[in-house]
């Protein structure tokens, strides 16, 4: 299944593993914020499609927001992504409809790196209507998931996905 979708598995021992140290508390990491509890556990592994994750995530900002994006929200998202792209920031989002889709699409149009963090297995394009977007992202950026191939999207997985989006970026911009 991984080979069919062009994915690979990485672990914390992989050279491609991103720097999660500032966000996750593990192995006695005293630098992680003390307010984090169980949700601050680093993933054991990640499934990846596209460019090496450490490279694309090195200078990244999350751009996220509502699924029901307004015309103003679309315009604001595109402007934010354009400004970040001018300074070579990678755009990270969850691949959902709304602001996430606008952010990824704008990044691709501006030829800046983008990372889609899936709330399902790496072999499952969700939402289905964004399948072409995920394929474009995998060609020029990176698609990742902490869920095993074959894992379907479930409500609780979106929260876990959001934690990963926040952990791998220098900051988060919430549009609408």
Protein language model annotation of sequence segments:
Residues 4-5:
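A short structural micro-motif
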């Amino acid at each position: 299944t991984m080979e069919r979708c062009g994915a690979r598995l990485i672990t914390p021992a992989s050279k491609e593993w991103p720097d999660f140290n500032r966000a996750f508390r593990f192995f006695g990491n005293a630098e992680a914020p003390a307010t984090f509890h169980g949700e601050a556990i680093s993933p054991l592994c990640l499934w990846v499609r596209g460019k090496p994750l450490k490279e694309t995530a090195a200078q990244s900002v999350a751009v996220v927001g509502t699924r029901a994006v307004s015309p103003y929200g679309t315009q604001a998202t595109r402007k934010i992504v354009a400004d970040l792209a001018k300074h070579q920031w990678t755009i990270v989002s969850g691949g959902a409809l709304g602001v996430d889709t606008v952010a990824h699409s704008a990044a691709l149009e501006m030829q800046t790196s983008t990372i889609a963090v899936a709330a399902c297995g790496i072999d499952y394009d969700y939402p289905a209507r964004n399948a072409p977007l995920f394929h474009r992202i995998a060609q020029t950026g990176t698609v990742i998931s902490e869920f095993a191939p074959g894992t379907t999207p479930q409500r609780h997985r979106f929260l876990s996905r959001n934690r990963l989006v926040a952990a791998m970026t220098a900051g988060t911009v919430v549009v609408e």
